[in-house]
Amino acid sequence: MDEEEAMLLLKEEDEGTRRTSVPTQLMKLKRTHWWILVFISIFFLISAQAIAVLLGRFYYNEGGNSKWISTLVQTCGFPILYLPLCFLPASHSSSSSCSFKTLVWIYLSLGFAIGLDNLLYSFGLLYLSASTYSILCSSQLAFNGVFSYYINSQKITCLILFSVLFLSVSAVLVSLDDDSNSPSGDSKWSYLIGCLCTVFASLIYSLQLSLMQFSFENVLKSETFSMVLEMQIYTSLVASCVAVIGLFASGEWMLLSVEMEEFHEGQVIYVLTLVGTAVSWQLGSVGAVALIFLVSSLFSNLIGTLSLIVTPLAAIAVFHDKLTEVKMVAMLIAFMGFGFYIYQNYLDDLKVQRAREAQAE
């Protein structure tokens, strides 16, 4: 490798590597520390999202029926994030890189998008079977691939493309293996509304991830993880306000006491279910936002889709669901897709290291 090629590779690192590997603002971290943070974020996203989905199913199975409560619990657990935020250095870089007005606009716009997204997902799950819902949710990978390419200049290599395809196929296989049917009594119009809500929610979710990555890299330009928590706290606050307004405007709040009394497992379990769901969704969201900060929005979305494959394992352990051959094949395909993306990050790191060595010579 000559000197000119080495300079080109280093230039690619400064301009584009952070979109497929580690961001430029995190170059100060040792690679070992970076990988530890990535795997911790992956663990939070997959485990917390799986627990949240299981608790959500438990809520509906035991008599819960409020769409706005289902929307609210996805974001109202943000106060727990103030505890770790107290032990992190303040994100002073955000105040110097953009104005307070810009910060407010970012938090408001993303918060409203999250609130709308959560509501649409609640409607989709209400009108669709679990299998149809999961198939439509997997479309977020395709949307995110497009948004990442145009908004974040994500390099869509063959390995990344294979990763997206493998995870999508895996999610579809798991969904097809689910023998649940549409909710009884729903009309064709309700089914159509559920499909449209779920697809539109997947589009908004993918756009939201890409816009978060764009905000971190080009607007906030923060170098601290406190900004990750602040992003999650303030956007969740806005989304929670949207859900609370909807809860009172729709009149569902008047039925909550009856719903609690008629909950099959009792009032205490009802409250614990909602609290556990709120905390789980919040931890999962922190993992998702952290992966956007550490890697990219596309990677965060890939791991989120991977959790759709891990959730059946949790259902097997909790609800004693049957592990079929199709689910086993889907799990294998999902982990292969995950491996493709990890290997792409390894190749990117190796290329940068060789370029640095060539420049040093």
Swiss-Prot record:
Keywords from the named record: Membrane, Transmembrane, Transmembrane helix, Transport
GO MF annotations, alphabetized: purine nucleobase transmembrane transporter activity; purine nucleoside transmembrane transporter activity
Chief location: membrane
Transmembrane spans: 35-55, 68-88, 103-123, 129-151, 156-176, 192-212, 238-258, 268-288, 289-309, 323-343
Domain of life: Eukaryota
Pfam family, one: PUNUT
Subcellular location per the Swiss-Prot or TrEMBL entry: Membrane
GO BP: purine nucleobase transport
Coiled coil: none
Membrane topology field: Multi-pass membrane protein
GO CC entries: membrane
Similarity comment: Belongs to the purine permeases (TC 2.A.7.14) family.
Protein name: Probable purine permease 13
Organism: Arabidopsis thaliana
